[in-house]
Amino acid sequence: MILIIDNYDSFTYNLYQAVGTLTPSVQVVRNDSLTVSEAAALQPQAIILSPGPGKPKEAGITEAVLEELKGQVPILGVCLGHQAMGEVFGGTVTLAPHLVHGKADDISLDRSCPLFKNLPPVIKGARYHSLIVEKESLPPELLVTAETHAGEIMGLRHRDYEIYGLQFHPESIMTPLGAVIIENFLSHVGALS
């Protein structure tokens, strides 16, 4: 089962649909409807932290999931979930130099990252965000996997754990190859039946 932590965002059900085309076992729970222990007791094969409004610290159990389940359950954070990943592991989340809502930008990929297997070096990615993880604040255990031409971080991976973050939205129609990214994540962590 894939567990999606819903951070009260309309994109959550786009994620649900994208995952549901790959595996029938998907469950969505609100970020304040259960504890991390209760989430772990569901025995998910992977957890996806959804986009959402506000700051990562205000997103229910989202940051606690990263802190308490690292190394136990593979995790993919999208937008707010990505920012939570950056913050939990020592990065700084700050106001983006340019607010971007509903724009598809070119995103350069590190194709050694399992999420970007069989993708071209640059893809279009949908951006809807006011905050970013500041590159200068990254600890050594967080590796940049995707960025804009201006150098804004669009993807992260943890050096030691199966934890990945995407600032852009793979579930959006404005990310034409987004379904491949989601499938690559689920396949890489062994979560496809």
Language-model region placement:
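Extreme N-terminal starter segment of soluble prokaryotic enzymes
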Residues: M1-L3
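Proline-aspartate-enriched helix->loop->beta-strand connector
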Residues: Q43-P44, P170
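Acyltransferase
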Residues: I173-S193
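Short amphipathic alpha-helix with an adjacent loop that forms part of the alpha/beta core around
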Residues: T35-Q43, S137
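Short hydrophobic/Thr-rich beta-strand motif most characteristic of the beta2 strand and flanking loop
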Residues: S25-N31
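Catalytic beta-strand/loop cores that center a nucleophilic Ser/Cys/Thr
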Residues: C113-D160
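Cysteine-nucleophile active-site neighborhood
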Residues: P44-C113, K117, I182-N184
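Two-component/phosphorelay signaling modules centered on CheY-like receiver
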Residues: Y16-S25
